[in-house]
Amino acid sequence: MNLRIVASHTIVCLCFAVASNAQIYKDPKAGIDERVEDLLSRMTLEEKIAQMNMNGMGEYRQLPYGAGVVESPFISVQEIARMSAETKRYAREHTRLGIPPIQIGECLHGQLAMGATIFPQAIAQGSTWNPALVERMASAIALEASASGVDQALSPLFDLAREPRYGRTEECFGEDPYLVARMGTAFVEGMQGKAEYTRAHGIAPGKLMCTAKHFAGYSVPAGGVNLGPASLGEREMRTLHLYPFEKAVKEANVCAVMPSYNEVDGIPAHCNRWLLTDVLRGEWGFRGYVFTDYGGLSHLYNFHHVAADASEAAVMGLNAGVDFEAARPDAYAHLLELVKAGKVKEEQIDTAVRRILRAKFMAGLFEKPYPDPGRLAEVVHRPEHVALALEVAQESAVLLKNDSALLPLDASKLKSLAVIGPNADQVQYGDYTYTRDNRSGVTILQGLRDRLGNRVRINYAKGCDITGSDRSGIAAAVEAASKSDVAVVVLGETSVILSGLGWGVGLGENEPRDPFVSG
């Protein structure tokens, strides 16, 4: 009798032990919050901290505790897919808990990878005044990038293009907060899926998580110098610069937010608790995670000088509400020692890691099929995406002036046409693209030659370079114009130069470049 009682108790205890050890976090039918708590309860402090840091994809196998995020290298989509499959397979099948990393990629106007479709830049997207078109474009970008393993896009920008000297205007949708909010939320819902769906089901296959940046007031620095301070005041901040981000959170359910490099009214964004916690989470109910701009926490001690060192920067960032450090462990590399020293509570680590894990479960990282390089040809740079890029470009065109109804040009009435300017024979794809090679596009000069053939004589002259003070080509440009019926003058700038202009340097040929790299 007693033996049977003991045996039954043993069976009950064994069943309870098996049930309590069930890996709920691996069950796709369980709720996201339930999966997060189950996984978090199994993690060591070292494993938790690893989730708050980022490394290169090629480094993953050497990391003892894994990494929260890996970065897609700037190579071909086929190579990215191959590396992604290897990295994620190793993470899921050969590490203690099988936690896959989030794979991030630049996808501002197409995936930053060789072979992906290049769409017009954000400033052109905003000029379409067509949110539905931008939503379709973002959906196409997501389809291409997800095929090579990307889980999260470091886009779009919700900055306002209100400072013409600021070097990243091309990345902005425009200057009006309402327009930027409409275009930005359309981009997010195209890339992530409709907010109603993502709130209920997470990120669908073929979609990506988005990152709203740069939070906030980044694009109006003093003197137009990138990273420069902004003096805005709370009313201007809320009315103009916070408005688009609020819409991204409340209406589009954006998954991540990236703080800006600069300071607003004396407080750097990466340690601004009012911005990252009180407003973002307390007022707007943001449930995603805060992802630093590259080196953003390091800037607290080596640029803004509000922290003495990387350790203090880590404390300041974590207290403000920064969950994740990119692009390499620096400040958050000190979290373990800070917890042991009592300067950071493990509960703070848990809070940040919960948010990161929640993003991973939302994106389906534990169940996603591994990327297949063999099927990329079916998805990437498909004809309908190229046609869509052309449609965006066509709708982005803005006619500022048309004296005497000169446009459109009638080739039957022209004998000669001058094509002049430093950008006439150079394709401008915009920044965050994998190529500047004319072979990947059509220059204005080549397009006119193709269109007009031998019917109209084209007189081409470069005239000058975009930078420098050499005026030796001006005479040829004047001559080309004087012997032509009409002149098409192709001016503007290039993204390479804009990255110099906005960083507070001049446009001379030998000007130094700023050492900081923007994300």
Named regions from a protein language model:
Residues S8-A17:
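Bacterial N-terminal signal peptides
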Residues M1-S8:
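Positively charged n-region of N-terminal signal peptides that target proteins for export
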Residues V18, A22-G519:
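Glycoside hydrolase catalytic-domain context in secreted enzymes
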